[in-house]
Amino acid sequence: MGNAELAGELRVTLSKLSRRLREQAHAADLTGAQKSALLRLERDGPATVTTLARAEGVRPQSMGATVGALESMGLLAGSPDPAD
């Protein structure tokens, strides 16, 4: 598979993921903070809670609560940070 073909498939996949996240965000009646965190993760990729909090301009404790709520809804799945 060439780079152009791979890039095309990646664009299609990301578009589908973006659409699904928007649909789920609406269906789940998420808070503004939850929607913002999901959209940032979609755009920027995986991040630690601390990094995400800094990017969103909130305290890590607040982002931890936001991420915890999203995990409990099944919209996020956390994994251990290898640098931790």
Identify the role of each PLM range:
Residues 21-62, 67-69, 73-75, 82-83:
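N-terminal helix-turn-helix DNA-binding core of bacterial DNA-binding proteins
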Residues 1-32:
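N-terminal leader segment of winged-helix/HTH proteins
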